From Swiss-Prot:
It holds the Pfam family Ribosomal_L9_C. Coiled coil: none annotated. It comes from Vesicomyosocius okutanii subsp. Calyptogena okutanii (strain HA). The gene is rplI. Keywords: Ribonucleoprotein, Ribosomal protein, RNA-binding, rRNA-binding. The keyword Ribosomal protein applies. This is Large ribosomal subunit protein bL9. The lineage of its organism: Bacteria, Pseudomonadati, Pseudomonadota, Gammaproteobacteria, Candidatus Pseudothioglobaceae. GO terms for cellular component: ribonucleoprotein complex; ribosome. PROSITE patterns: RIBOSOMAL_L9 (PS00651).
Length: 150
């Protein structure tokens, strides 16, 4: 099924691209979320009329992402979790924990934009990637510390 993308979508395409995707993905995700329209003649004409507005909005989003990238480049997030004496965590650190830590640091990041390359099950330092935009990914240092028992 051919659709016109109304925004940049990672691993799929950029604003204005006409791509082939599966019908279910189109019906259940892209169209209801306003991320795409069916590639009919009327929708193509309509898209050309609103293309300038969408490109301005996309440029603004890119500018905001670059601003966040410069602030976030040297950020170190410290997460405290229950751990054994050897440093093994009771459980693991997931995207929700990292998102909470980033919010405390002053960054509003969605969980789906956080990429953890490996499972975090021990105390120590880790590098994670945060996708701010389709073209902008920033690497953030995460420090996992054992919670101090009183």
């Amino acid at each position: 099924m051919q659709v016109i993308l109304l925004e940049n979508i990672q691993k799929l395409g950029n604003l204005g691209d006409i791509i082939n995707v599966k019908a279910g993905y189109t019906r259940n995700f892209l169209i209801p979320k306003g991320k795409a329209k069916l590639a009919t003649k009327t929708n193509l004409v309509e898209f050309e009329l609103i293309r300038a507005k969408l490109q301005i909005a996309e440029a603004k989003t890119l500018k905001n992402a670059k601003a966040i990238e410069t602030k976030m480049t040297n950020t170190i997030c410290i997460i405290q979790a229950n751990a054994s004496e050897e440093g093994k965590l009771f459980g693991s650190i997931n995207t929700t924990d990292i998102q909470t830590s980033l919010i405390k640091s002053g960054f509003k990041i969605e969980k789906r934009n956080i990429d953890i390359p490996e499972t975090i099950r021990h105390t120590g330092e880790y590098k994670i990637n945060i996708n701010l935009h389709t073209n902008i990914t920033v690497s953030v240092k995460i420090v996992i510390e054992a919670l101090q028992k009183v």
